[in-house]
From Swiss-Prot:
It is an enzyme of class 2 (transferase). Transmembrane segments: none annotated. Its EC number is 2.1.1.177. It comes from Rhodopseudomonas palustris (strain HaA2). The keyword Isomerase does not apply. GO terms for cellular component: cytoplasm. It is found in: Cytoplasm. Belongs to the RNA methyltransferase RlmH family. The keyword Methyltransferase applies. It comes from the Bacteria. Homodimer. Specifically methylates the pseudouridine at position 1915 (m3Psi1915) in 23S rRNA. Keywords: Cytoplasm, Methyltransferase, rRNA processing, S-adenosyl-L-methionine, Transferase. This is Ribosomal RNA large subunit methyltransferase H.
Amino acid sequence: MRLTVIAVGKLKQGPERELAERYRARFDDIGRKLGFRGLDIHEISESRARDAATRMAEEAAAIAALVPDGGALVTLDERGKSVDSAAFAAQLGRWRDESVPGTIFVIGGADGLLPELRRKAKLCLSFGAATWPHQMVRVMLLEQIYRAATILAGHPYHRA
């Protein structure tokens, strides 16, 4: 199963990008041994439309163009479901074992995600009720993906 992160907005050079790349590389090392075929990251430019509804619609269209049929769509949203790391790992493992071709994680821009896109998701995931900058959400998501792989592998990184 291939994992994909689609994020509205680009990470500039700096500590967030370095940390994101570190977790991605760590996942690649352990993920392949677990039957994951890699982790792709696609950055979508933020819409420059004047109103939020138009911005979200334009960003949703760009996201939809990158979402393959048959994959498990996971949106990140403050109204989503909070799951612990073990449950997140178990869900990724189930999708892998069910031969789901890919899991696609979507991080919205400053205005969030279009409600229609959130409704299409198999899982709407939250990192709590707080609002986080999209740069931090990307790092947090990549860390959780790496952590999930270590849980599935029985690696000591996760000590719960």
